[in-house]
Amino acid sequence: MANSKSALKRIAVAERNRLHNKAYKSAVRTLMKKYFEAVQAYGNNPTPDNLSVVEQCMSAAYSKIDKAVKRHVLHRNNGARKKARLAKALKQVATAS
């Protein structure tokens, strides 16, 4: 256990940041899952409506990833890798149909 006042404060700050980061990462994962589901639906039925849903999901996911990188929740390479996975999924479906 911490002995000094400043160490106790650091423990409190670390816990606060951990919970904040956990919420951000959870939101990123949720938006990515929604995007992959939208891409799969677009692959099964490629209509302009489904494409617009995919684009909205992509925009939301990209935005949340970029904000997580900006706030140092994710490393920039990790954010870039996640965005590349999203783009790759759509590209594979687009070339298949």
Swiss-Prot record:
<dbReference type="InterPro" id="IPR002583">
    <property type="entry name" value="Ribosomal_bS20"/>
</dbReference>
<dbReference type="InterPro" id="IPR036510">
    <property type="entry name" value="Ribosomal_bS20_sf"/>
</dbReference>
<keyword id="KW-0699">rRNA-binding</keyword>
<comment type="similarity">
    <text>Belongs to the bacterial ribosomal protein bS20 family.</text>
</comment>
<keyword id="KW-0689">Ribosomal protein</keyword>
<dbReference type="Pfam" id="PF01649">
    <property type="entry name" value="Ribosomal_S20p"/>
</dbReference>
<comment type="function">
    <text>Binds directly to 16S ribosomal RNA.</text>
</comment>
<keyword id="KW-0694">RNA-binding</keyword>
<keyword id="KW-0687">Ribonucleoprotein</keyword>
<dbReference type="GO" id="GO:0005829">
    <property type="term" value="C:cytosol"/>
</dbReference>
<dbReference type="GO" id="GO:0070181">
    <property type="term" value="F:small ribosomal subunit rRNA binding"/>
</dbReference>
<dbReference type="GO" id="GO:0015935">
    <property type="term" value="C:small ribosomal subunit"/>
</dbReference>
<protein>
    <recommendedName>
        <fullName>Small ribosomal subunit protein bS20</fullName>
    </recommendedName>
</protein>
<dbReference type="GO" id="GO:0006412">
    <property type="term" value="P:translation"/>
</dbReference>
<dbReference type="GO" id="GO:0003735">
    <property type="term" value="F:structural constituent of ribosome"/>
</dbReference>
